[in-house]
Amino acid sequence: MRPAPPPPLLLLLLLLPPPSLSHDGTIIAATSPTSGQPSTELPGGKGLITTAKTIQNTDLAITGEKVMSATVSKGPLPGSSNSVSMTLAPTQKNTVIAPDQDEKVSTNPTIATSDSKGIPDLNKSILPSATNSMKPDTPVTQTAGPGAQGNPGTTVSHMTSENTEQTTSQPPPQVKPSSITPALTSIITPTSPRQPSANSTTLKPPESSSESPDKSHTASSSLGTKVVPSSSLYGTSPTRTSSVTFWGGPQSSSGTPPVPAPTPRPAATSSSTPGISSVPGTTSLPSETESLESPSSESPSQPPKLRPTGPPSSGSSGPAASLPDEGPRSSSTQRAATAPRAPSVPSPTSAQGDDRIKCESPGRLTDKMLLLNLTRSGLCAGNNSDDKLITLLCRAAKATFNPAQDQCHIRLVPIQDTQAVAIKEITVQTNLLPRDVYELLKDKWDELKEVGVSNMKLGDQGPPEETEDRFSMPLIITIVCMASFLLLVAALYGCCHQRLSQRKDQQRLTEELQTVENGYHDNPTLEVMETSSEMQEKKVVNLNGELGDSWIVPLDNLAKDDLDEEEDTHL
């Protein structure tokens, strides 16, 4: 039997946002299972909205690994302010909630069905129930009916007040379907993506079974409410815990089964979407456009997924529940995948070899070329690793070639049909530091001054004449002057001393001559010798006779002879 197509009322429910978005923030989750007519506004003209329509004996099953259904509506009620009620229900295997038949106020959550392996069961039905708005400070209890299979169900207790909301989750038993009607096998696919609104509900697919549990999602909102944690069951064990964080008193549910206990979380740590404005008294959550994929385009083992197609809304004032999805990859993995890779840098050896040798197009041999016949493969054949040959060629161009300071470029022309190469040009580029240039220019400072250079300075060092001639030239001049003065003084002293000594000698001789001329002298023998000429003659004769053949004269003989002669003379 072919399933019935979805009615247009459900399309309006999922595609069009409800009106009356600028009221005081009261949320109404309402569905009517018994009447086939669409719900209308309540008396008073305030725009009270019901967010679900009913289908007699047919239901819509949104399948997936885990689908969180949330029914959120907004409308003003007299005497109520900032009261929020959200119905969040996880998916379970073979679980159906029977509708409320007496059209009374019912707050049973809507539960989608899926098997324990995550494959959706399209033969299970979901019967929505009618829910009216709740007044402030009114506790409402939502309970899933008991089942026969023993799987845990869900019991959700909402305590709604002006600024607080607490949600506890307890494990209920699984419920068997009592009357299962044929479900809709076709999944609603919107024809055009609608724009995100404040009251839209975003349903996200869960992670796969390989993802680790205890993951929580937090959506930021404005001031006035608290955390609504909800536990989700995947088979028999929960896979993750979704939480909606409101601004007033932030709380988040932990992922420890079976009952997640709300723990306080600072509002600053909640993951917020940029561009969302918050207004006190209302809730503002990022909402996205729902995009439902048809399961016919996928394999039966892969459940349909709901993917967001629109950007988050900004400036929304009405409440909107958003259950964000976390992709299979973490943010660090995505950043690593999208990070640009740096280009591979060639090694210094290969880059240097390619830079030093440049081979031009082959040419013919001429007499003016400098040829090098290579026994091994030529330099132009790709063998640029012969650094010794390159160094020898560069040192031939510059004797003081230093590979660490100089860069050598050789242009070669390979010869056809031979391993010979012709050297066309060798260029050596020297990279000098400023201090090396200063040391070289110091010796040529005079030439620099002639060409118009007036000053040269490197740090504290200036031109060479300021550092060297400042003390050397005056010192040299002083030394020369002192030496000349000392030589002059020595010459004057020598001349004066010589003249004084000559004067003394001349004066003494003059005095002696004057005494001899006057007949007065101190030598008595001189007078005897001068007066006795005979004795002098005798001495001469005696000396000549005795000393004729020899210059040696005995003193004793001379003394005796002299004494005898004197005695004879006196007699």
Curated annotation (Swiss-Prot):
Outline which residue ranges sit on the Cytoplasmic face: 496-571
* Annotated signal sequence range: 1-22
Q: Which InterPro entries match?
A: CD34/Podocalyxin, PODXL
Transmembrane domains' residue ranges: 475-495
Q: What's any one GO cellular component for it? A: membrane raft
Q: Where is this region: Disordered?
A: 94-361
Q: How does it sit in the membrane?
A: Single-pass type I membrane protein
Entry PTM:
N- and O-linked glycosylated. Sialoglycoprotein.
Amino acid composition bias (Low complexity), ranges on this chain: 282-300, 312-322
One Pfam family, short name: CD34_antigen
This protein's source sits in the domain of life called Eukaryota
What spans are recorded as compositionally biased (Polar residues)?
106-116, 126-144, 151-169, 176-203, 218-245
Instruction: Tell me where it resides.
Output: Apical cell membrane; Membrane raft; Cell projection, Lamellipodium; Cell projection, Filopodium
Q: Which residues carry this modification: Phosphothreonine?
A: 531, 569
Q: What does this protein do?
A: Involved in the regulation of both adhesion and cell morphology and cancer progression. Functions as an anti-adhesive molecule that maintains an open filtration pathway between neighboring foot processes in the podocyte by charge repulsion. Acts as a pro-adhesive molecule, enhancing the adherence of cells to immobilized ligands, increasing the rate of migration and cell-cell contacts in an integrin-dependent manner. Induces the formation of apical actin-dependent microvilli.
Q: How does it assemble?
A: Found in a complex with EZR, PODXL and NHERF2. Associates with the actin cytoskeleton through complex formation with EZR and NHERF2. Interacts (via the C-terminal PDZ-binding motif DTHL) with NHERF1 (via the PDZ domains); interaction is not detected in glomerular epithelium cells. Interacts (via the C-terminal PDZ-binding motif DTHL) with NHERF2 (via the PDZ 1 domain); interaction is detected in glomerular epithelium cells. Interacts with EZR. Monomer; when associated with the membrane raft. Oligomer; when integrated in the apical membrane. Interacts with NHERF2.
**Similarity comment:** Belongs to the podocalyxin family.
The molecule here is called Podocalyxin
- Recorded source organism is Canis lupus familiaris
Instruction: From the UniProt record, report the name of the gene that encodes this protein.
Output: PODXL
